[in-house]
Amino acid sequence: MVLSLILQLSTLWPACRADFTPTAPLASYPQPWLGAHPAAVVTPGINVTLTCRAPQSAWRFALFKSGLVTPLLLRDVSVELAEFFLEEVTPAQGGSYHCRYRKTDWGPGVWSQPSNVLELLVTDQLPRPSLVALPGPVVAPGANVSLRCAGRIPGMSFALYRVGVATPLQYIDSVQPWADFLLIGTHTPGTYCCYYHTPSAPYVLSQRSQPLVISFEGSGSLDYTQGNLIRLGLAGMVLICLGIIVTCDWHSRSSAFDGLLPQQN
């Protein structure tokens, strides 16, 4: 009796899940596109809308988050797109999202192919970028050098700064998670750092990169030699002063000693 009941329930289980569990999609069911407004990188407390757009009219849309088996949200519509609203997002709502859609004339449990994966990042500050010199931080005098500022998120705006200068030297909007800044001519040597941020409001700024020193070939050894000469010169002056003090002290002691000797008649 118990075994029979278990078998009956097991046959009903797929039917219960068929309406919301995507099956292996067929090639004839093209994938939708998933986007975020105002951006995929936002600060906490912002309202975010995820839009799932299908290439054809659909009946039901489903939004999925990585790590969850069932849809996070469902929307029943009769057009090509559905909007999923995430109110006052928190860092915990960040993650990987994708969406699917289905039509009324599709079989039970048949969903479209999954959309592109959208990475939603909710943070007050973006991770620190790296700054490297290509081909290297030591270049021939007058040669050009390229500085690559690399973050972790594509589609950001990058700014290159020179230490001691308040305004950015160069500014680049990049579709890649990095940007290359070209430094030309004799003004290349110096210390540089970079930032990146979201290209539109609400702006989220990264931490500053570690400073990078660019120098010409031979300038480091020349500075080192000059430093040694300065140190040797100071040491020589100290020795001369000590010698003068010792000599003066010896003369004063000698004169005092002569004064103590008895005078001969």
Swiss-Prot record:
It comes from the Eukaryota. Residues 1-18 form the signal peptide. InterPro entries: Ig-like_dom_sf, Ig-like_fold, Ig-like_Receptors_ImmuneReg. It is a single-pass type I membrane protein. The keyword Transmembrane applies. Keywords: Cell membrane, Disulfide bond, Glycoprotein, Immunoglobulin domain, Membrane, Receptor, Repeat, Signal, Transmembrane, Transmembrane helix. Residues 19-231 are extracellular. Glycans are attached at N47, N144. GO terms for cellular component: cell surface; plasma membrane. Disulfide bonds join C52-C99. GO terms for molecular function: collagen receptor activity. It is found in: Cell membrane. Pfam families: Ig_2 (PF13895). Belongs to the leukocyte receptor complex/polymeric immunoglobulin receptor (PIR/LRC) family. Regulator of osteoclastogenesis which plays an important bone-specific function in osteoclast differentiation. This is Osteoclast-associated immunoglobulin-like receptor. It comes from Mus musculus (Mouse).
